[in-house]
């Protein structure tokens, strides 16, 4: 197997780029990417894509993520973590009750200003490079979503609190920590940060690597995860020989979804966030039961005067991933085509 995922745990103290170099050296491969950079001072899940799996990285970047982080109250650093310089102090430590109660204020849609020490670009230059040169960095506010936030532990003696959060892409935990502290009439920065989950990738079965000598290529590949694993909750279409040929050559092709889908239904659902900020959305969902696995898939739909579209589906040919794309009525439009097999026609 040459196209797969690896569930890697990045240790604290090395950059995501350094870990990529280590994995490349072990595997002897150059087509390797990762989903979601972690700061040097952070640790945790960093999914790696090998070979054709790199074409699916954008799906993982969009996936929900979970973190556990510890905030030190009373000080603020220029980087938002312990690697930066202290730029302000305000020794005001919240009570345990306040540290727990503040969480509800942040659940839902929130607006963040990214930290100056970030990989975002300002006029073509990475923000952290400008910040290191002590140049003024102005970044635009960004919208993000906090699905869950709770305090796990409060230590009054050391003026720290540990939190768990589940959030959307683009969420800066350092900014969240600073905003939490400000809401508690204090200052704060992150002293520990661990990413515990990215989509289907969890820390309990992650591979821990610090150097190329710690694991062999064979041992690493034995822990590989099939390329289709992150597509398990996305609608799959099985292509015929003629459909596969059309997709392979970049052509649009038709699928008879009413015939292919064993179970089709539309229903409205509402998603609510509790707290000061509430969001409710209504959409339609396609339900399909896969007879071979017994699993039921739920996909968002746009239904208007008989028009059906699905933003993301994947196509399988002879049991192997062929393409991902969108379905507009019966027409499949490919976004990525994969070269996983030579078994064509």
Swiss-Prot record:
Keywords: Isomerase, tRNA processing
Pfam family, one: TruB_C_2
CDD domains: PseudoU_synth_EcTruB (cd02573)
Active site (UniProt): 39
EC code: 5.4.99.25
Catalytic activity: uridine(55) in tRNA = pseudouridine(55) in tRNA
GO terms of biological process kind: mRNA pseudouridine synthesis; tRNA pseudouridine synthesis
SUPFAM superfamilies, alphabetized: Pseudouridine synthase
Record field: transmembrane: none
UniProt keyword tRNA processing present: yes
Molecular functions (GO terms): RNA binding; tRNA pseudouridine(55) synthase activity
Enzyme class at the top of the EC tree: isomerase
Protein task: Responsible for synthesis of pseudouridine from uracil-55 in the psi GC loop of transfer RNAs.
Family: Belongs to the pseudouridine synthase TruB family. Type 1 subfamily.
HAMAP family: TruB_bact
Full protein name: tRNA pseudouridine synthase B
Organism of derivation: Rickettsia peacockii (strain Rustic)
Gene: truB
């Amino acid at each position: 197997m040459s196209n797969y995922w690896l569930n890697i745990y990045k240790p604290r103290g090395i950059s995501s780029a350094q870990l990529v170099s280590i994995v490349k050296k072990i595997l002897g491969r150059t087509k390797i990417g990762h989903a979601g950079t972690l700061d040097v001072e952070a640790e945790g899940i960093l999914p790696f894509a090998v070979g054709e799996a790199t074409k699916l990285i954008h799906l993982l970047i969009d996936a929900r993520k979970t973190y556990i982080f510890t905030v030190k109250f009373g000080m603020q650093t220029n980087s938002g973590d312990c690697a930066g310089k202290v730029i302000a102090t305000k020794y005001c430590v919240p009570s345990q009750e306040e540290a727990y109660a503040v969480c509800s204020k942040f659940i839902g849609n929130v607006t963040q200003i990214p930290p100056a020490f970030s990989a975002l670009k300002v006029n073509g230059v990475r923000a952290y490079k400008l910040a290191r040169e002590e140049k003024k960095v102005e970044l635009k506010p960004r919208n993000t979503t906090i699905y869950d936030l709770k305090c796990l532990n409060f230590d009054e003696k050391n003026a720290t609190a540990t939190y768990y959060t589940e959030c959307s892409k683009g969420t800066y935990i350092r900014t969240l920590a600073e905003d939490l502290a400000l809401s508690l009439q204090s200052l704060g920065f992150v002293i520990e940060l661990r990413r515990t989950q990215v989509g289907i990738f969890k820390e309990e079965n992650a591979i821990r690597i610090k150097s190329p000598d710690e694991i062999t290529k064979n041992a690493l590949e034995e822990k590989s995860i099939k390329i289709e694993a992150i597509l398990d909750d996305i609608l799959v279409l099985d292509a015929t020989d003629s459909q596969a040929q059309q997709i392979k050559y970049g052509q649009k092709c038709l699928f008879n979804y009413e015939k292919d889908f064993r179970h089709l239904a539309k229903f409205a659902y509402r998603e609510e966030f509790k707290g000061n900020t509430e969001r409710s959305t209504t959409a339609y969902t396609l339900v399909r039961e896969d007879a071979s696995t017994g699993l039921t898939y739920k996909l968002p739909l746009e239904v208007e005067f008989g028009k059906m579209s699905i933003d993301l589906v994947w196509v399988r040919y002879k049991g192997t991933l062929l393409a991902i794309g969108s379905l507009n009525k019966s027409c499949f439009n490919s976004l990525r085509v994969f070269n996983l097999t030579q078994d064509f026609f």
